[in-house]
From Swiss-Prot:
Record's keyword annotation contains Transferase: yes
Leading EC class: transferase
Alphabetized UniProt keyword annotations: Glycosyltransferase, Metal-binding, Transferase, tRNA processing, Zinc
UniProt keyword Cytoplasm present: no
Cofactor(s) demanded: Zn(2+)
InterPro entries noted in UniProt: ArchSynthase1/Queuine_TRR, TGT-like_sf, TgtA, tRNA_ribo_trans-like
Name of this protein: tRNA-guanine(15) transglycosylase
Gene: tgtA
Catalytic residues (positions): D93
Family statement: Belongs to the archaeosine tRNA-ribosyltransferase family.
Signal peptide: none
Pathway: tRNA modification; archaeosine-tRNA biosynthesis
Amino acid sequence: MRDVFEVGAQDGLARIGELDVPRAGVTVETPTLMPVVNPNLITVEPSRFVDEFGAELLITNSYIINSDDDLRERALDEGLHEMLGFDGAIMTDSGSFQLAEYGEIDTDTEAILRFQHDIGSDIGTPVDIPTPPDADREQAAAELETTQQRLELAETVDVGDMLVNAPVQGATQPDLREQAGAHAYGTALDLFPVGAVVPLMNQYRYDDMTEAVLAAKRGLGRDAPVHLFGAGHPMMFALAAALGCDLFDSAAYAIYARDDRYLTVSGTEHLDDLHYFPCDCPVCAEHSPQAVRGMAAGDRERLLAEHNLHVSFGEIRRVKQAIKSGTLMELVAARAHAHPSTLDGYRALLDHSDQLEASDPASKDAFFYTGAGSARRPEVHRHHQRLDRLDVDGDDVLLTEGDSNHRYDESWNVLPPFGPYPSALATTYPLTAETPARMDRAGYEAAAEGVCRLAEANPDTAFTLAHDDWPESALEAVPQRVSLYNAVRGE
């Protein structure tokens, strides 16, 4: 067990956690967002982060500080906390982003870790190699080997009680990501950033991002705190949490504000296109878009950055509540349908229902069917997998969406998308699900999969499925030996 991270409530891979940061003397509740602070260009004073926005942790770049003589001297003299005016925990990056952007940097793992320690960082980062997406396998494997060597070197650097990140690389090669996760987890390092996914997010390739993160998670242990490097847009926090990520960082709040862009949970709006602010944060409650457009550039940038922080931390709180109440997948589905790319990410997530199911609580408060994706959720997968454990009494069994019939030895209920279940389970989760009266094709097809599973597990039992006018695509999936009766048409 890693002593610095404790997992609490879970919903699939998502969890509420407590990250102990000993050097800062604080415990951070996750999931959480780290505002990125560029010490050369501060848009919102970090001294405001804790009380006004709820930030417990920020991230800044030690390479930028080390490369500027004035900043370097200030940081060494004052320490990061005093220099930035921030009382929470501080994570520092090593310059790997600059390495990805410019191809080289003037530092190494040992030197930058010692510098991070000397300026008072609470969580440091070695210099890893951020292999770009779609790099060929040879490049990805070679650069991963270099990263792993640097992680092993980082273990040997004496940094006191400063925590150290162990970045997980591997480009878009799932097996390399999984291998990288296992190697990183096997070190004595503390946190596990999934790196080099910013290009995927910038290109709206949320499906590929999902595959990369889930592969890394397969290599990491349950007690590994995971940081999704560069995840700063609130539209994808719910998805990222559902992937099992605990820490996100946002430079977007400031970068977007500089370009008059306004973040929402469903995308990005340009200030010029807004007649009303669709938000009740202090900035939006006290100003109109017209008033903000008329301000001086610096004031406009600051207010937009403040809004962007408010909406981002508001979404983090919403994600936490959804995890606590067991409704995160409903939130993910709602966010996914706001943009085709997040929908791709959601569908990629559902392709791994077995991985989600392994850590999903067996019982929650409610299951809401909100669309075709709900038919592929872990709860449906789990129900189908467990059908062969249930005893069927009798040789002639009715599976029905309606009332039981005493002409059969036994009657089972049928509820799309789950399919058949004994009436004794009717009041248990997830069979208490709220489903629409007009079920979609995917829900019926999933129910048919459940019928197949039950029939396969009981080859000597005769089954009759009394359905409420299911579509042909679902009926075609039912085994031929199962008799069909359309209860709506009476045939």
